[in-house]
Amino acid sequence: MPKSDIHPTWYPEAKVICNGEVVMTTGATQPEIQVDVWSGNHPFFTGTQKILDTEGRVDRFMRKYRMASSDSSEQKDKSSEEKKES
């Protein structure tokens, strides 16, 4: 027999909700569970492909990489000019 007042309340008919729609019921310690993805809308389980826009990330990386390389070359040029003047 479990001790009283130490165990969470068990909800045998807890609702799993995705995008405002009840997708299934299960047992849980919360009456409602909000989820973003479930097997009914996940591309792996539905067989659909979702194209991700990664171009923005690549562009951001390339800009950062170019800036870092151009900044470092400018700094090297400045430091070599300062050494020549001394």
UniProtKB/Swiss-Prot annotation:
PROSITE patterns to which the protein is assigned, alphabetical: RIBOSOMAL_L31
Q: Where is this region: Disordered?
A: 65-86
- Record keywords: rRNA-binding included? yes
GO molecular-function annotation terms?
A: rRNA binding; structural constituent of ribosome
Q: Which domain of life is it from?
A: Bacteria
- One GO BP: translation
Q: Which InterPro entries match?
A: Ribosomal_bL28/bL31-like_sf, Ribosomal_bL31, Ribosomal_bL31_A, Ribosomal_bL31_sf
- Bias (Basic and acidic residues) occurs at 73-86
Q: Which Gene3D superfamilies match?
A: Ribosomal protein L31
One GO cellular component term of this record is: ribosome
A Pfam match: Ribosomal_L31
Q: Which UniProt keywords apply?
A: Ribonucleoprotein, Ribosomal protein, RNA-binding, rRNA-binding
Q: Check the record and name the PANTHER family matching this protein.
A: 50S RIBOSOMAL PROTEIN L31, CHLOROPLASTIC (PTHR33280), LARGE RIBOSOMAL SUBUNIT PROTEIN BL31C (PTHR33280:SF1)
Task performed by this protein: Binds the 23S rRNA.
The subunit structure is: Part of the 50S ribosomal subunit.
Recorded family membership: Belongs to the bacterial ribosomal protein bL31 family. Type A subfamily.
Quote the protein name from its UniProt record: Large ribosomal subunit protein bL31
Which source organism?
Prochlorococcus marinus (strain NATL1A)
In the record, what lineage is assigned to the organism producing the protein? Bacteria, Bacillati, Cyanobacteriota, Cyanophyceae, Synechococcales
